[in-house]
């Protein structure tokens, strides 16, 4: 949250970093290769939606611009299938959103595990992270709903009371999966326990409910290693009868301030 950062640390630190970047610019070399060309069966993408209501809107619309937009959208392909449909049927899903991370992690020397995941797994470049206030929660919101966040507000906070029928949680709920979500920090910034519930998460686990150590200061964030260990226990408990599950986990250890000492950061510095 840039606004909160300025309030807590002032503008001096950011100014110094900007000056440093001008005098000593850093060149980022992307040395990773992702040239996987999987042969996929062509999927039938015939439009599968009842357009009765949409046609009625178009028929009764007097504004020519709105009508043109509606005609554009109604002629787009809408299907519940794509090239990956059914590939992971009946599999469990763990989504890990890393707070404050970027593609610097895709480095075989310093981060071999991330590099392996990126180059040997699937990766997509057509993804854009909003660089605005509330960046973390706006990205989380987009990932959970496939909706763009609003650039000038914290979308998840402003619309936390809405019900999101097509969220990732509800998609899995309709398939009788056990769903839950978790973040290893408090709700001092974002109302996750409220919006996650309205998105269909079966249960939300904050840092207190996880029972792991944390600090109210920026100095020492909760330990993501302990976070993952706590989550594994939750999974074991919730799937004692071999139920399928889906969970969304948002980490915290790599959060700013990046120039300050921290327990997790010092382990690898």
Language model features with spans:
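Solvent-exposed soluble domains appended to multi-pass membrane proteins
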Residues: 62-269
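N-terminal secretory/membrane-targeting segments
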Residues: 1-91, 107-111, 118-119, 126, ...
């Amino acid at each position: 949250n840039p606004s909160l950062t300025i309030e807590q640390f002032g503008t001096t630190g950011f100014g110094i970093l900007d000056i440093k970047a001008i005098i000593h610019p850093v060149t980022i070399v992307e040395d990773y290769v992702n040239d996987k060309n999987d042969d996929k069966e062509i999927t039938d993408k015939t439009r599968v939606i009842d357009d009765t209501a949409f046609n009625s809107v178009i028929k009764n619309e007097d504004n020519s611009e709105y009508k043109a937009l509606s005609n554009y959208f109604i002629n787009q392909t809408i299907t519940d299938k794509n090239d990956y449909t059914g590939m992971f049927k009946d599999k469990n899903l763990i989504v890990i959103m890393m707070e404050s991370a970027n593609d610097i992690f895709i480095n075989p020397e310093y981060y071999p595990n991330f590099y392996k995941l990126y180059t040997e797994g699937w990766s997509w470049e057509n993804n854009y992270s909003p660089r605005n206030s509330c960046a973390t929660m706006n990205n989380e919101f987009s990932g959970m709903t496939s909706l763009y966040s609003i650039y000038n507000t914290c979308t998840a906070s402003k619309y936390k009371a809405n019900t999101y029928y097509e969220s990732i949680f509800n998609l899995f709920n309709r398939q009788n999966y056990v769903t839950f979500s978790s973040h290893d920090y408090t709700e001092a910034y974002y109302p996750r326990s409220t919006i996650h519930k309205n998105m269909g998460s079966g249960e939300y686990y904050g840092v207190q409910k996880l029972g792991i150590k944390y600090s109210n200061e920026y100095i020492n964030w909760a330990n993501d290693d302990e976070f993952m260990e706590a989550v594994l226990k939750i999974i074991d408990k919730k799937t004692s009868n071999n139920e399928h599950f889906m969970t969304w986990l948002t980490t915290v250890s790599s959060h700013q301030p990046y120039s300050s000492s921290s327990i997790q950061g010092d382990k690898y510095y």
